[in-house]
Amino acid sequence: MENRWQVMIVWQVDRMRIRTWKSLVKHHMYISRKAKGWFYRHHYESTHPRISSEVHIPPGDERLVITTYWGLHTGERDWHLGQGVSIEWRKRRYSTQVDPDLADQLIHLYYFDCFSESAIRKPSLGHIVSPRCEYQAGHNKVGSLQYLALAALTTPKKIKPPLPSVKKLTEDRWNKPQKTKGHRGSHTMNGH
């Protein structure tokens, strides 16, 4: 029998970002209780030796599974130390991989109060509307002018610690263009 390969998309992430994300997930599962129904699976509960943890997020009757890996092959950069994250959407026997933006939208849709475009219609129907969005990572586009005007009237409430964002977990913070200060800024940058 020949070997069969299965290819998965794994986002390379540095381990400190993974540790921060895990602690945010645990905080909102056990302390703030905003992540109701979420399930955290430790590395010792998995049979796969490379799985560091799994977070199961059930939006509706399906599941979003965020798996963190360790011991992967290192990448071409120094900080690619063999840590990674995969994001999978499962419903019964069907599963597919999703990108971090879609994962955040699914989490946002099912779990957190939001003052969104539908809030313009809801008060006229007699529904109660939340005056803010608790999970800003779930929005990836600019809203309508009505929405922006209503959002400008409400002051956003800062949540400490922030809610766990899958996009923030997988973003590449190392390859962004470096911002340097002007003439009066950092003296080490301009050689003085």
Swiss-Prot record:
Q: Where is this region: Membrane association?
A: 171-172
Which Pfam family, giving just one, matches this sequence?
Vif
PTM description = Processed in virion by the viral protease.
Q: How does it assemble?
A: Homomultimer; in vitro and presumably in vivo. Interacts with viral RNA and Pr55Gag precursor; these interactions mediate Vif incorporation into the virion. Interacts with the viral reverse transcriptase. Forms cullin-5-RING E3 ubiquitin-protein ligase complex (ECS complex) by interacting with host CUL5, RBX2, elongin BC complex (ELOB and ELOC) and CBFB/CBF-beta. Within the ECS complex, Vif interacts directly with host CUL5, ELOC and APOBEC (APOBEC3F and APOBEC3G) substrates.
User: In this UniProt entry, which residues are annotated as the site Cleavage in virion (by viral protease)?
Assistant: L150, A151
Q: Where is this motif: HCCH motif?
A: 108-139
Protein name as catalogued: Virion infectivity factor
GO BP term, pick one: viral life cycle
Q: What is its main location?
A: host cell
Q: What induces it?
A: Expressed late during infection in a Rev-dependent manner.
Gene name per UniProt: vif
Query: Where is the protein situated, by its record's location annotation?
Result: Host cytoplasm; Host cell membrane; Virion
What functional role does this protein have? Counteracts the innate antiviral activity of host APOBEC3F and APOBEC3G by promoting their ubiquitination and degradation. Acts as a substrate recognition component of an E3 ubiquitin-protein ligase complex: mechanistically, Vif hijacks a host cullin-5-RING E3 ubiquitin-protein ligase complex (ECS complex) and the transcription coactivator CBFB/CBF-beta to form an active E3 ubiquitin-protein ligase complex that targets APOBEC3G and APOBEC3F for polyubiquitination, leading to their degradation by the proteasome.
Residues binding Zn(2+) are H108, C114, C133, H139
Give the species this sequence originates from. Answer: Human immunodeficiency virus type 1 group M subtype B (isolate RF/HAT3)
Q: Which GO terms describe its cellular component?
A: host cell cytoplasm; host cell plasma membrane; membrane; virion component
Q: Does the keyword Lipid biosynthesis apply?
A: no
Chain positions covered by the region annotation Interaction with host APOBEC3G: 40-44
- Please name the GO terms that the record assigns under molecular function: metal ion binding; RNA binding
Query: RNA-binding: present as a keyword of the record?
Result: yes
Location of region: RNA-binding: 75-114
Q: Where is this region: Multimerization?
A: 151-164
Residue(s) carrying Phosphothreonine: T96, T155, T188
* Remarks, miscellaneous: Vif-defective viruses show catastrophic failure in reverse transcription due to APOBEC-induced mutations that initiate a DNA base repair pathway and compromise the structural integrity of the ssDNA. In the absence of Vif, the virion is morphologically abnormal. HIV-1 lineages are divided in three main groups, M (for Major), O (for Outlier), and N (for New, or Non-M, Non-O). The vast majority of strains found worldwide belong to the group M. Group O seems to be endemic to and largely confined to Cameroon and neighboring countries in West Central Africa, where these viruses represent a small minority of HIV-1 strains. The group N is represented by a limited number of isolates from Cameroonian persons. The group M is further subdivided in 9 clades or subtypes (A to D, F to H, J and K).
